[in-house]
Design a protein with these regions (language model features):
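Long, charged, low-complexity intrinsically disordered regions
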Residues: 1-33, 40, 47, 51, ...
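Short, glycine-/small-residue-enriched flexible loop/hinge segments at domain edges that mediate gating
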Residues: 29-32, 55-61
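Short acidic beta-strand-loop surface patches of small beta-rich interaction domains
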Residues: 63-66
Length: 94
């Protein structure tokens, strides 16, 4: 799998796109950021999700629970704690 750097308007982090098992992933790493940068980048990154086959993956230094309330009913998420203590959150359309 190769990850391609993509431009996402109004973001401050690098976003990468890749395909795996028929799904398109858009990924960013917010572990070096401080609030509100991770939330702002996530909210703009969610605009990339156009179909049931798209996923947005964010890597965070803690679980971003305040962010979940901002998702509304359009998106769902899966949170996975990594061995490093960081969190991998995968967002998709509901």
């Amino acid at each position: 799998m190769s990850k391609e750097l993509i431009q996402v308007p109004m973001t401050t982090l690098d976003f990468f796109q890749y395909t795996q098992e028929g799904l398109t992933y858009y990924e960013f790493n917010a572990t070096e950021c401080s609030p509100p940068e991770p939330m702002v980048n996530t909210m703009h990154g969610l605009n990339l999700i156009k179909s049931q086959n798209d996923r947005l993956v964010g890597i965070f230094f803690h679980e971003p629970t305040p962010l979940y309330a901002k998702l509304g009913s359009r998106f769902s998420y899966d949170a996975q704690e990594l061995e490093s203590g960081d969190f991998r959150i995968t967002f998709k359309l509901t």
